[in-house]
Amino acid sequence: MHPLGRLREVEVAAVSDVKGHEINSADPIFGIEIHGLDPIPPEDAHGHPSELFWTWLGGNFNYIVLTTAALTVLFGLSLWQALLAVVVGGVAGSVVLGLCSVFGPRTGTATIVNTRAAFGLNGNFPVALVSWLSASGWVAVNSVLAVFALIELAQVAGLGNGVAVKIASVAIVLLGQVAIALFGHATVVASERIFFAVSAALIFGLLLFALPKVNWAYAGGPPLGSTPLGNWLLGLSVIFAGPISWINYASDYSRYFRRDTPSRSVIFWAFLGMLVSTLLAGLVGTVLATLVDMSNPVANLPKILPGWYLVPFLLVVIWGATANNVLNLYTAGLGLLALRITVPRWAAVCLVGAIATALTVIAVFFYNFMSLYAEWLSLTLILLCPWGAILLVDWYLRRGSYDAQALHRWGSGPYWYRSGINWPTLAVYAAGVVAAFAVANSTLWASPISTRLLGGADLSLFSGLIVTGLLYYLVAGRQIAAAAAKA
């Protein structure tokens, strides 16, 4: 018998359920999910789009998103300018995430597999690698913040902050995250409800202590950009990068829905969950950044809190990073499978966890956290925006009609193209990345066009999406129409 068949036989369904999530023997809560990238068969489909609300709310209403909002104030924006950037960036990014979620019910597979239709099965490898690096990198970025908080907690307990404490903190943080993600989809979705409930209580506690001290007329510090508009666009880009960094995850959490699930419902619930989390965390983050230097948030923020709230504050950081990384690890595991690494899904999660542990150790001992975070945000935006544009325009051109089995058929089929590569699409993606880099302004790369001609404005998000989307529409429109006519 095939190992998956034996696993299906011995799998024990969860004895308890979370409201809104159906018990399923192929995807049980606190049991090993048996599916990897293979299309979810109709008999294993389950769930409701409202699950997406809790998934994205639980995964994003946390300290790491709060820190993202704080970057807008660190860039020199006033409080109200920063809040406007949070609203505009949050709405725009959440719309894109919602749209990218519709593939799940149609194809029953992970997001990164769906772009095989545009790139070809072999041509999809470069973007699959980008997606995997993005997810794995976010595991490390979040883990670094959690490790710093755990080290502070160890100091409170009188254990010091020596090398042994740091290594133990890394191990505890990564093992806890991997333990949840390796179970699979149902466990991840169910756990995010719990993550949100605890995070909300702790984060709103921070807000209660901060509100009486807020200077609502805060005018901002020294601007990072050379013009007010350029500075605001820089802040907008950072907020937009948050939801955009999840678009390669979107269908991973909607793929178990039934094939006839309305697309509007999928879009709405994913959009709402991401938007609410971004706005709530954005409000708290911008307010706190006007009161304390957030360049080192774990060390500086406790200065404005009562002494007794230090431990709950540190738990906010650890808990939120875990909630975020459970999603990251699950998708990174699927991403590794998309690179044709022939291991079970749970083993892929463990492998990603090991790699992230190494990256976290490097960051904890040798690198400034906020520099790492800002650079990773900008790189994520530049590499994923062009890919997201191709994903969405391809959906529009095909009217959402995909051959789910052909997405996994090597050597033949409508998505095989020439030796499995659709070279025009790869060229469009490369052009989109170049267009984004050409007008980027970040700690990673500041283009001469941005600094000299645009007043420091970072237009990489607009350039990456618009240029790539238009080019792909022009290049692929006729190709897809011709293929449809032959079918």
Where are the model-predicted features located?
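Membrane-interface "cap" regions at the ends of multi-pass membrane proteins
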Residues: 2-79, 230-236, 255-263, 479-487
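C-terminal membrane-solvent junction of multi-pass transporters and transport-like membrane proteins
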Residues: 39, 387-471, 485
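Hydrophobic, small-residue-rich membrane helices and short re-entrant helix-turn-helix hairpins
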Residues: 45-49, 183-196, 245-276, 294-300, ...
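Hydrophobic, membrane-embedded alpha-helices of multi-pass small-molecule transporters
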Residues: 49-66, 207-214, 223-288, 307-326, ...
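Membrane-water interface regions at transmembrane-helix termini and the short interhelical loops
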Residues: 74-76, 102, 118, 126, ...
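Juxtamembrane transmembrane-helix boundary signature
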Residues: 85-119, 129-143, 477-479
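Transmembrane alpha-helical segments of multi-pass small-molecule transport proteins
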Residues: 128, 156-183, 197-208, 235-248, ...
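Hydrophobic alpha-helical segments and their helix-loop junctions in multi-pass secondary transporters
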Residues: 148-151, 198-222, 239-244, 284-291, ...
